[in-house]
Amino acid sequence: MKTFHIATAAVLAIAAVSPHAVAQSSQSSFGSSSRDSQSAAPSTSKSAKPKEPQLNVRDVYSCPTPDKVQRQAEWKVYNTSGLALTVYVADDAGNAYQVLERVGTPAKRAWAPKLQDGTYHLTCVFHNDSAVKSDDFTVTGSTITEAPKMVPITDREVAAVAIQQAAEQKKRVPELQKKAHALADATSKNRPTARAAYLDYLETYRSFDDSSEMWPGPDLEGYAEVEKLLWSKRPVKDAAKPARALADAVDKTARALETSHFAIPAPDYGLRTHEVMEEFERFDMRGERDFGAHALPTALRGNVTSTRLTLDAVRSLVEGRGLDTAPIYDQLDELDKIAGEFDEKYDTAFDKWSQKDRMRLQSAVARANELLAPVATMTVIRRMD
């Protein structure tokens, strides 16, 4: 039975967050095992391990119910629903246990969740669609006595966080307007002044979460053209027109936000806490957002601010479920430090940096994304109420 509608993100990361939090999921993709390819000759051993049951997810209207589990669950999840899938184990008290995430379609994955004796059900969470509950199944004879678990965060709780974050972000829009107009004014001056104003704008723009792309009002991507012109051999005044257009777009967006409401959709909120840094790793560090300024440290500072502000709003919620956020904030501080250090050291593209410094930044960003991953998971595994 379909129980409630959510628009969950397809890309989730899972990690063990505390002795009381959700246990780490099976991360390995399914592949044919040797026992699957053995001949059909009858076995002479009575203790031969049976083939894992297959849980078939055929559509978005039902979630398969496992047979009774003796000792240890070992399943193969086969998703042919047409949508990416996340599956987790839950009990009637509302606790979530273990998660199998990022099951594509069609795709087959092995899953061996560690569960103690008890009664459970599965919840299938479909990308941009529904969460569907299976019937109950039981586990008996398990050697596990304290399976890690988490009381799921509710939709109402996440929605409140999204509204709070949106209100705080809205207060900062006038700052973006100010920086945009300062940039437009600077294009009538010398190149160093105009470039400095651009970098100031860029850092402020990057300090907003990436859902700003969905704000009401015009597109705010015009900064790329300004950057190309200011770091070219063309006269500074050539950047005046796109800079004025950018300032006008920011003004129109500010007015639109005054008369309408926008907040990160609740099902996506946890993902947004680390999507900014993931996209920095995926795009900025590959040079795809370098339009001539070689301003990677500036972009990093803005992204760190964005991540902090998005995490601040949900911090008490995830800490209440057992997540220690102190290491996350420490790592963001480390990234800020690295950004300042490399801003002084480099004015070249990232691929021209020394290998040692590239690896240092790559490692620090990857660590931040690793630490942020449980926030996404904890806000998508939600009680169905």
Question: PLM features: residue spans?
Answer:
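Asparagine-centered strand-capping/turn motif at beta-strand->loop junctions
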Residues: 77-81
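Mature extracytoplasmic or organellar-lumen-exposed domains after removal of signal/transit peptides
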Residues: 142-385
